[in-house]
C-alpha cells in the first residue's frame, strides 16, 4: 500500500502527484483492474499465450 505524507509547505497537488507516481510505480492500480472480475484459468492461459504471440511479432 502506497503512503504519502504531505511535507511542510507542500501543496496538495504536489503531494497528489507524488502519490500517483508511487501508485503507478508499484503497479497497484493495474493489479486492481486485473482482479476486478474473476478470470477462469483457461482464459488466463489464453490471454497469456496471445500476449506472448503479440510480443513475438
UniProtKB/Swiss-Prot annotation:
Q: Which GO terms describe its biological process?
A: translation
The family database entries (PANTHER family) matched by this protein are listed as:
MITOCHONDRIAL 28S RIBOSOMAL PROTEIN S21, SMALL RIBOSOMAL SUBUNIT PROTEIN BS21
Gene3D superfamilies xref list: Ribosomal protein S8
The record, for HAMAP family, names: Ribosomal_bS21
Family that this chain belongs to: Belongs to the bacterial ribosomal protein bS21 family.
Entry keywords, A to Z:
Ribonucleoprotein, Ribosomal protein
Coiled-coil region(s) at which residues?
Answer: none
Organism this protein belongs to: Geobacillus sp. (strain WCH70)
Q: Which Pfam families match?
A: Ribosomal_S21
State if Transit peptide is listed as a keyword: no
Would I find Flavoprotein among this entry's keywords?
no
**What InterPro entries does its record include?**
Ribosomal_bS21 (IPR001911), Ribosomal_bS21_CS (IPR018278), Ribosomal_bS21_sf (IPR038380)
Per its record, how is this protein called by name?
Answer: Small ribosomal subunit protein bS21
Q: Which Gene Ontology CC terms are recorded?
A: ribonucleoprotein complex; ribosome
Quote one Gene Ontology molecular function term: structural constituent of ribosome
Amino acid at each position: 500500500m502506497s503512503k504519502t505524507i504531505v511535507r511542510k509547505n507542500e501543496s496538495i497537488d504536489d503531494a497528489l502527484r507524488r502519490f500517483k507516481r508511487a501508485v503507478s510505480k508499484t503497479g497497484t492500480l493495474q493489479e486492481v483492474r486485473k482482479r476486478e472480475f474473476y478470470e477462469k484459468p483457461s482464459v488466463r492461459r489464453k490471454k497469456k499465450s496471445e500476449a506472448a504471440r503479440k510480443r513475438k511479432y
